[in-house]
Amino acid sequence: MIDKQFDKETFKKSVKDNVKFLYRRKLEEATQEQLFQAVSYTVKDVIIDNWLDTQNAYEKQDPKIVYYMSMEFLMGRALGNNLLNLGAYGEVKEALEELGIDINALEDQEPDPALGNGGLGRLAACFLDSLATLGYSAYGCGIRYRYGMFKQKIENGYQVEVPDNWLKYGNPFEIKRDEYAVEVKFGGYVDVEMHNGRQKFVQKGYQSVRAVPYDMPIVGYGNHIVNTLRIWDAEAINNFNLDSFDKGEYQKAVEQENLARTICEVLYPNDNHMAGKELRLKQQYFFISASVQRAIAKYKETHDDIRKFHEKVTFQLNDTHPTVAVAELMRILVDEEGLEWDEAWEITRKTCAYTNHTIMAEALETVSYTHLRAHETRSNL
């Protein structure tokens, strides 16, 4: 059941207020999309109370945190699922009926979040649901794709693939967490400098994007617990180069913005050509680097000794795509935290766990050494 006593009249008033404040309309004038958004924001208000309570409880308990890293999460529609897990579906259905709103029509209005495609993504979503229901402290970590893969239309008897613009009207269940944004660097070269008698590897000449997290609630079934799916969007560090634009170099003026947008456009871009292989590698490194950076920063908010990182954090790597987390954690521990290689490797081994989904060679993703060297950030790899 809902943690607090459900008040039908308060819920109905909140729906009406959301329609008014979001769209400057009366309830009876609202479209189905506007009603869906208004009701979803009302439900999110209920969820947020439990979300805050959950995070406060975790902070007091200081449990080990699982970061479930996956290229995809096939979550399904959120409105009905959240209400079922809150134990509030029947009560909300009744309240909406009194407003003349059909809850089934609202559920049909919601697009499927285009964050996953098949069994790999569905398994990831099921794990997140189970972790919340069992009361484990966990984050899902992935990419906030703008178009996912595609949606199908049948025209003249043939399948036509078109972009799945699931974010066209926004996602009412997500919260942008700009305060946790981090920089992710690609390419460049490495200078070796001496600091306090130690070699320090300094990356220079790189391209970078700003990784911005969006949090979605994962509601546990009947237990008031709400965990987090954190999906990362890419933004340009500098959106617009006015100097290039004034020189007539219009493509160069938006080069950084285009780089950022490309990273999060689609799930599994075609990799039959080199540009596609490069984009996939960038996608994987992008969300892994952002997630690892944030996990370390969160750990250091309450713990002083990075050498005990593995005692409080586990990275669960869902198939081959996120395995670059091993290299990224090593890079940060050695280059930024100043640990020796063997010590960092021991921590990394105890932190990273891997889920294998197949033994077929053609399904196990690989990256050529030559291709990887083009994007390496260590001169001695």
Give short role names for the model-derived ranges.
Residues I65-I101, N223-T314:
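Function-dense linear segments that define catalytic or interfacial modules
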Residues L128-D129, T133-K151, W341-M360:
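Glycine-rich phosphate/pyrophosphate-binding loops
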Residues Q316-E328, T351-T355:
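Core structural elements
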